[in-house]
Structures are given as C-alpha cells and as structure tokens.
C-alpha cells in the first residue's frame, strides 16, 4: 500500500539548517507604529492605554531565523512510501516500489507457501479447447446435470463432462446448476470439442488467471487455412462493409483489404448486436473460426469499434492493400493496333481499376447500357469480366446476384427515370441488407449534356459514376468536356482526338480484358459484332470484324454445326440482338443475351440455332414494315448535291412493334443507300408527332461537315419554345420536341440541310 512518508509527513522535504531572516535581518520585527494615530474621531480617554507597538516579521514569524530545506532522503522527495500489505513494514520509496505489495520477508514466506499449493486456472473468454492441458486443474461452473454426469463450463466456449465415476468424495446429486467447482482435465479432444474431467477435493490451491494473447492475423491467411484453423481463436481488424440482421445473430461483413470475413454476434436472437457499429466503421474483432456455406465466419468473442488515429491508420492500410490488389492489367496489348486506343489507355486503366476496387471494397456495381447491339455488347463484356472477380472475392455466396446488376436503358442517354430506379433499389438494399451504395458504370451513353441531370442526382448521394461512351460529347477543351465536371472517370475516343467508330462494345471489351484477362476467349469476338451493329467504319473496325469471324468459325467447328461465316453473319447477330432487345425492354436478358452474342462458348450450337430462329422472325417483321414504309418514303435531290429522304413514321409505319422508329429509319436509309451508292451524300429523316430520327452516310459528314449534334444545338437556340433536345453520333441520332411545333422544327432542319455547302477541295 502507498502511505505518507513518516519522516517528512508527506511534504517530500526536510530542514537541514537555519539562517538569518532576510526580511527583518534577525530582529523578528519589521516596523513600529502608534495605534493612537490610527484612531481618529475617537476620544482621548478611549486611546489612553494605546502605546507604541511593533509588527512581527511575516517571513520568520518573529523568530529572526528561517529554515533551509532539502529533499527528503527517505521518500526521495515524493512524500510517499510503499508499505507491505501483510505486515505493514516499509518496503521503499514511491514510485520505485509502487508495484510491490509484500516486503522481502513476507514475499519469501508467500513463495514457500505456494510451493505446497496446486495451481488452479481460471480461463478468460478467449481460451479454447486447444488451451486445456491434461492433468491441470481448472475452475468452472456447472451448467447442466444429466444422469450420466455434469457438464462443466470453463468459459462460454469450453465445456467438458464430469462423470460420477470420476468423482472423489462428491456425489452427482450434491451438484446444482450454477455451482462453482474445481476439476482436473484427464482427457482432452479439442478436434471433437470434448473434455473429460475428474474431481479431486483441494483444500489449498492458488488461483491463476489464464489470459490468452491472440496475435493479429490477416483474413486472407485465415481463409487459406480454413479447415486447419477451425475452432481456433483469431484476432482481426478491418472495415465493416455490410451489416445483416438475421433471425439469429447480427452478421457483420468485414474486410482488412486482403479478403472478407463474416463476423456473427449474438446477444438476443433477432436483436441487433453492437448498435453503435455502422457500415464504414473500423472494428477490432476477436472470435472463434467457423465455416458457413464453405466460407469463413468468425463467432464473435469481442468486438470493439475503433476511433481516432488508430482507426485512421487501419483505414489507410486497408485502402493501400485494396489499391494494390485493384491494379488492372493496364499494359495488356489491345486486340488490334490503334493509336486512339493507346492514347485512351490511361483512362481505360483508371476505369478498370475503379471497377476492381469497387468489388474488393464490397460495393455493388450497376452497369447501365443503351438497349441496342452496341450497348449490349459493351455491357456483356464488362459483365463477363466482373462476375468471376465478384465470385472470387465475394462477401457472400450469392454475391453475383446481390452485388451486380446490368440494366438496359431505352433512351440513348441516362434518363432521370433510370437513375431514380437505380437510387431507389440501391437505397433499399442499403437499408435492408446493409450494403454500401453502388458504383454506376454507364456504357454507350453518359457523355452528353443530356446525361448530366441524372448523373448529378446520383452524385448527390455520393455515388461514384463512370462513363464509357463513344457518342459525340460536345466541345472538347484540354481533353475535357462538360460532363467531366460530374463524373469520376470518363472514357470516350473524342477526348483524345478519335471518333465514334471505336464503339462502346470495343471500349467495353478492351476494358474488360484489363479487369480480368482470363475472359478474353469468351469476349474477343464481341467488338466485331458491335462495330457491324453500329455501322462503324475504319481500319480498327475491320480488324475487329476479322477477329470475330475467326473466333466464331473456330467455335462453330469445335462446339457447333461446323459452319463458315462471313460479315453477313455478324449483321445477322446484330439484327437478332436488336430484335430481342425490343422485347426485353428493361430486362437484362441474362442467359438469352449470352446465347445471342455467343459468349456461352460450350453452347455455341444453341447460339447458331437461336440466331436462325430469331433472324427469320426479325426479317419477317422488317419486310412487313418495309412494305408499308418504302412507298411512303419521299426522296428529294437537293441543289447542293445531297439526297434527302423523309418519312412520316406516324402515318406510314406499324406502331408498337419491331422494328421501332429508329430501326425503321435505319432500314429505309439502307434501302436508299443500296439504290444510289454509299459514296453519295444521303440523309434520311423520319418523324413522328414529337420526335425525329436521322441517318446519314459518311459522305455527308466528309463533304459537308454534317454533324447532327451541332444542328440540334442550332435548333435549340433558334426555336427555344420547342423544348428541343437530342443528338447522338455525327451521322445518326434523334430529335425530341413539343408536338405543336413539329412542322417548324422539321421545316427548319430541312432548311439547314438545303443550305449546306460542300467543303472546298
């Protein structure tokens, strides 16, 4: 025990000598005064007995000397000493002996006493079956009594059986549930979670607390040795990425950057454990390793939320580890040689890393793509790359269904309707299942100013948005466009001096190969389908077509009907995809789309059969539509050399069936192109009550600088009351306007076409 020093009485100092007082110089007084002079307005009689007096020195209190102090030798100046708890003898000065409780004599007596005692161990909550040693004594509690014996718990995890035959001087009927008892372990089978106890009465013993130190482990190391480490107590630290309340325990999904682990915490069945812990918090967990659905689950023994510098340091380490593992195959050679792709490589690698990082960080991924062949090609390529990574690093066995969504968009831009659905479902999942908010990947849309309202709405919730597009994004200034102020990453050929001929299917496939190079054989033919379906031109497009045909012919020989295909077959696939997309509407078409685009390699025979069926159905509907459209198509040869074709699809085309107005315009345009030649400047305009669809040959763009997006901007300025928007590619896109001003908008559009002049040679 700690007490005041008996020498200095707790002051920590002692008097060593006295010296003359420096204030009074040894007199003991500092001044004389007459009290009478300070008694004004008082009668002389009252002050008669007051004579001159002296004031004692306040420093020496009238003694004329003052003490000189030094540090107390006994207590070392602390004012405290340590006494023996048993005999009261002084052990030494404080704090040198602060940890001592017994003096040397009593300590020696205690050691002699303990030599004749047995150690009885008291387990803490971290001890397991593997910590029990045969022959040693343990203190436990009776938790259950049966005819064949009593069950003794050493802690919540460790329990053994004490049989009547192993009791000395004790009968089973004398035990009650809740009794404390000292038992000896005689047989330990930790792999079976079984212990046999023996009771021997002990009169004198020494209780020893068994405190287990659990070293910090990485989740990856535990997962890789799951069977060997089953039932062992482990210690992890990480970030909570999901919280699910089951009818039993609360299940926390935790990552330390190396892998994921479930941590099950049960207080009361169905009641939320650790309500102070939220998604995104850093926690320290000690628990027992178990296996659930073939994956690591830790049954919590201790779970503590960490805060401050310690939490930030762990968060930083997790971020660094995820960053390292998220690195894509950024230097992988592209499928074709392309200067534009090489200039886009840093942006594509950034997108690939962000997608991989979202998977490793436990964030869901939503892919939004345009509902046409090119959009589906880009979306499917990314899906094929992402799903194996999710499955490999998943935080649950059904993660490919819970953490990945691919959704088509009917509009050629990210609509407010689309983002509203994405937000509602994502917020519901966050509330119901404790998921993080997702990463949204827009492919084959997202680059234009029409996308900004929807993207802004997603960003209001802190959602990361990535754009992979090939549509004209507007004016490019220093490699950036307007939408770049709203998105986290943007891949578009226009940003590096390219054009729309590197389609979304091309970009999606090349990024998918960076994300997961192992899927190349499943998707290498997809860009060829995309460029044909989107009427892309150029050397790169032809290279992709060749790769696609080589791959499809190879698959047909190995898994299919042994056919040999040419470019026309890619056109058939593209038409079938557009045909199926019309009926899929807002469904992702998982499975069917795989077969149409031939990504289900071993079922290539089914792909061939499906294409034959769908193509026949689609062509019947196209021919039916063309019989109505071609006679109504008006062709005008303008003075500037442009061949202008107009069609009222509201009156002369079948509604609410395939092909839709956009595809109908395309087929009508192809009919005119075949008639007059692809090298001619041909523009086809079809229109309905409140929309217009435009298709043009490359010759119009090359000879007349035709760019639909610029014409749309001009119309928006000239006719603001039409509430006009739209756009797309330079030679293909759409217009939207109010129905009452259709004639004015269409008339002005035609007037602009007529006023176009060929470029000077």
Curated annotation (Swiss-Prot):
Keyword flag Secreted: no
Zinc finger (CR-type): 1-84
Superkingdom, taxonomy of origin: Archaea
Entry keyword annotation includes Zinc: yes
Pfam families: DHH, S1, tRNA_anti-codon
InterPro entries per UniProt: DDH_dom, DHH_sf, HSP_DnaJ_Cys-rich_dom, HSP_DnaJ_Cys-rich_dom_sf, NA-bd_OB-fold, NA-bd_OB_tRNA, S1_domain
Gene3D superfamilies, per database record: 3.90.1640.30, 6.20.20.10, Nucleic acid-binding proteins (2.40.50.140)
Identification of the protein by name: Uncharacterized protein MJ1198
Species of origin: Methanocaldococcus jannaschii (strain ATCC 43067 / DSM 2661 / JAL-1 / JCM 10045 / NBRC 100440)
Taxonomy of the source species: Archaea, Methanobacteriati, Methanobacteriota, Methanomada group, Methanococci
């Amino acid at each position: 025990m700690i007490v005041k020093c008996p020498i200095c009485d707790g002051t920590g100092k002692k008097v060593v000598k006295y010296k003359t007082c420096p204030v009074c110089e040894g007199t003991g007084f500092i001044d004389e005064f007459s009290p009478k002079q300070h008694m004004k307005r008082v009668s002389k009689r009252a002050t008669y007995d007051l004579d001159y007096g002296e004031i004692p020195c306040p420093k020496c209190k009238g003694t004329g000397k003052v003490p000189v102090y030094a540090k107390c030798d006994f207590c070392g100046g602390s004012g405290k000493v340590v006494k023996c708890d048993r005999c009261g003898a002084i052990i030494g000065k404080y704090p040198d002996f602060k940890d001592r409780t017994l003096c040397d004599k009593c300590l020696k007596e205690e050691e002699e006493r303990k030599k004749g005692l047995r150690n009885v161990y008291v387990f803490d909550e971290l001890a397991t079956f593997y910590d029990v040693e045969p022959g040693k004594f343990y203190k436990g509690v009776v938790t259950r009594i049966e005819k064949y014996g009593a069950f003794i718990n050493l802690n919540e995890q460790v329990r053994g059986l004490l049989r009547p035959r192993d009791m000395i001087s004790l009968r089973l009927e004398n035990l009650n549930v809740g009794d404390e008892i000292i038992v000896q372990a005689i047989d330990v089978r930790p792999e079976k979670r079984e212990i046999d106890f023996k009771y021997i009465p002990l009169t004198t013993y020494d209780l020893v607390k068994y405190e287990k130190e659990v070293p910090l482990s990485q989740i990856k190391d535990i997962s890789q040795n799951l069977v060997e480490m089953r039932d062992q107590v482990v210690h992890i630290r990480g970030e909570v990425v999901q919280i699910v309340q089951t009818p039993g325990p609360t299940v926390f999904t935790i990552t330390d950057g190396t892998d994921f682990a479930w941590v099950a915490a049960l207080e009361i069945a169905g009641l939320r454990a650790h309500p102070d812990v939220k998604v995104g918090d850093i926690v320290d967990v000690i628990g027992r390793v178990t296996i659930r659905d073939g994956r690591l689950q830790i049954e919590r023994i201790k779970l503590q939320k960490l805060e401050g510098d310690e939490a930030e340091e762990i968060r930083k380490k997790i971020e660094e580890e995820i960053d390292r593992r998220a690195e894509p195959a950024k230097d992988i050679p592209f499928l074709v040689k392309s200067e534009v792709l090489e200039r886009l490589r840093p942006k594509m690698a950034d997108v690939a890393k962000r997608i991989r990082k979202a998977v490793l960080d436990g964030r869901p991924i939503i892919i939004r793509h345009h509902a046409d062949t090119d959009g589906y090609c880009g979306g499917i390529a990314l899906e094929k790359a992402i799903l194996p990574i999710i499955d490999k690093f998943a935080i649950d066995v059904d993660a490919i269904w819970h953490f990945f969504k691919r959704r088509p968009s009917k509009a050629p831009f990210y609509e407010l309707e689309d983002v509203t659905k994405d937000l509602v479902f994502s917020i519901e999942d966050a509330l119901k299942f404790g998921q993080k908010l997702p990463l949204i990947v827009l492919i084959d849309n997202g680059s234009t100013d029409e996308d900004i309202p929807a993207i802004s709405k997603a960003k209001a919730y802190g959602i990361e948005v990535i754009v992979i597009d090939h549509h004209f994004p507007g004016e490019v200034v220093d490699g950036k466009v307007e939408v770049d102020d709203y998105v986290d990453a943007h891949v578009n050929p226009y940003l590096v001096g390219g054009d729309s001929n590197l389609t979304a299917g091309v970009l999606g496939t090349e990024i998918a190969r960076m994300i997961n190079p192992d899927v190349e054989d499943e998707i290498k033919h997809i860009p060829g389908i995309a460029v044909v379906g989107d009427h892309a031109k150029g050397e790169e497009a032809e290279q992709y077509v060749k790769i696609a045909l080589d791959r499809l012919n190879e698959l047909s020989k190995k898994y299919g009907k042994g056919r040999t295909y040419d470019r026309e077959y890619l056109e058939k696939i593209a038409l079938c995809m557009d045909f199926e997309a019309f009926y899929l509407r807002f469904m992702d078409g998982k499975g069917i789309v795989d077969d149409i685009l031939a990504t289900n390699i071993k079922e290539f025979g089914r792909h061939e059969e499906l294409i034959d069926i769908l193509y026949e159905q689609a062509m019947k509907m196209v021919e039916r539509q063309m019989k109505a459209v071609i006679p109504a198509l008006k062709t005008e040869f303008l003075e500037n050399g442009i061949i202008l074709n107009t069609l009222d699809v509201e009156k002369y085309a079948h509604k609410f069936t395939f092909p839709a107005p956009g595809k109908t315009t395309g087929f009508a345009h192809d009919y005119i192109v075949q008639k007059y030649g692809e090298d001619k400047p041909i523009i086809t305009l079809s229109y309905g009550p409140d929309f217009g669809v435009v298709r043009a040959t490359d010759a119009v763009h090359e000879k007349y600088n035709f760019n639909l997006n610029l014409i749309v901007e001009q119309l928006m300025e000239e006719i603001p009351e039409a509430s006009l928007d739209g756009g797309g590619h330079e030679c293909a896109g759409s217009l939207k306007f109010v129905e009452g001003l259709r004639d004015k908008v269409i008339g002005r559009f035609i007037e602009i076409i007529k006023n176009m002049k060929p470029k000077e040679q």
